[in-house]
Curated annotation (Swiss-Prot):
UniProt name for this protein: NAD(P)H-quinone oxidoreductase subunit 4L, chloroplastic
Protein localization: Plastid, Chloroplast thylakoid membrane
Annotated membrane topology: Multi-pass membrane protein
Function statement: NDH shuttles electrons from NAD(P)H:plastoquinone, via FMN and iron-sulfur (Fe-S) centers, to quinones in the photosynthetic chain and possibly in a chloroplast respiratory chain. The immediate electron acceptor for the enzyme in this species is believed to be plastoquinone. Couples the redox reaction to proton translocation, and thus conserves the redox energy in a proton gradient.
Alphabetized UniProt keyword annotations: Chloroplast, Membrane, NAD, NADP, Plastid, Plastoquinone, Quinone, Thylakoid, Translocase, Transmembrane, Transmembrane helix, Transport
UniProt GO cellular component terms: chloroplast thylakoid membrane; NADH dehydrogenase complex
InterPro entries: NADH_UbQ_OxRdtase_chain4L/K, NUOK/Mnh_C1-like
Gene behind the chain: ndhE
Coiled-coil stretches noted in the UniProt entry, renumbered to this chain: none
Transmembrane feature ranges: 2-22, 61-81
Reactions accelerated catalytically: a plastoquinone + NADH + (n+1) H(+)(in) = a plastoquinol + NAD(+) + n H(+)(out); a plastoquinone + NADPH + (n+1) H(+)(in) = a plastoquinol + NADP(+) + n H(+)(out)
Organism: Pelargonium hortorum (Common geranium)
Assembly information from the UniProt record: NDH is composed of at least 16 different subunits, 5 of which are encoded in the nucleus.
GO biological process: ATP synthesis coupled electron transport; photosynthesis, light reaction
Length: 101
């Protein structure tokens, strides 16, 4: 596979994630956009690791580390959102000021 194609794909994923994170008013949509951004970054790590130095697995190992952190975020994020919804009755970003009671 050509390096430019993979870089365009990963930048497209990252750009969709940034756009979704900036324009979303819903916290669940923001978490999904964050996952898209992390997947774009992981695709870059794996591509550069394979393309430039295929014997050393530094990019692959770092990508696995980022996937583990994304899995923890995907497990803890909805729990935090359900707690916020129980207290505030809304999961909209602009309505949930967590510093006020």
């Amino acid at each position: 596979m050509i390096l430019e194609h993979v870089l365009v794909l990963s930048s497209f994923l990252f750009s969709i994630g940034i756009y979704g994170l900036i324009t979303s008013r819903n916290m669940i949509r923001a978490l999904m956009s964050l996952e898209l951004m992390l997947n774009g970054v992981n695709l870059n790590f794996v591509t550069f690791s394979d393309f430039f130095d295929s014997r050393q697995l530094k990019g692959d190992i770092f990508s696995i580390f980022v996937i583990a952190i994304a899995a923890a975020e995907a497990a803890i994020g909805p729990a935090i959102l359900s707690s916020i919804y129980r207290n505030k009755k809304s999961i909209r970003i602009n309505q949930s000021n967590l510093l006020n009671k």
